[in-house]
Amino acid sequence: MSITNATISQRAKKWLEDDRIFIDTETTGLGDDAEIVEICLIDSAGFIMLNTLVKPTKPIPAEATAIHGITDEMVMYAPTWKDIHGAVASLFFEYGFVIYNADYDTRLIYQTAKLYGLENDGFCYFLNERSACAMMLYAEYRGEPGRFKGYKWHKLVDAAAHEGVSVEGKAHRALADCRMTLGIIDALAKGGAA
């Protein structure tokens, strides 16, 4: 194992030892008006801390439903972001987050919180600072040159397949994606597949 990959392995182990929470969201889209429609948080042992659909403020576009399968009917009686914001914030402050593509999910958490006037609390302020990006760690581990911070980014399902992590459930659903992220970090902590 190279010195770089040994360091990456140590960082992955630290995330697991620190009992970080692994988080994933599904959303209404990619833009500045997108919001969260599903969120899952699991601990480093895979225990589900929170797994819920989230009722958005506007209809879910067909393009988003085509990716994650979440429909307006499914979220009709789900809690709103305002209902779960406190629980998510509490887990964040207690454990910190590991997210595959942290920039995206933290932006969507902020955008969704802002819709309810919750963007100015300490949670949203510290979100980027205390969220570790599993995608960036994996990109560094693979070491393939790319245009994003010097490394090629890998899709979650591709990274999971490369590391021998099976998909439990449907990819592009928050619980399955959390489990894949945890599996990738666990594989890196053990030295990775390559």
From Swiss-Prot:
Signal peptide: none annotated. Keywords: Exonuclease, Hydrolase, Nuclease. Transmembrane segments: none annotated. Its EC number is 3.1.-.-. InterPro entries: Exonuclease_RNaseT/DNA_pol3, RNaseH-like_sf, RNaseH_sf. It is an enzyme of class 3 (hydrolase). GO terms for molecular function: 3'-5' exonuclease activity; nucleic acid binding. Disulfide bonds: none annotated. Residues 20-185 form the Exonuclease domain. This is Uncharacterized exonuclease CP81. It comes from Escherichia phage 186. The gene is CP81.
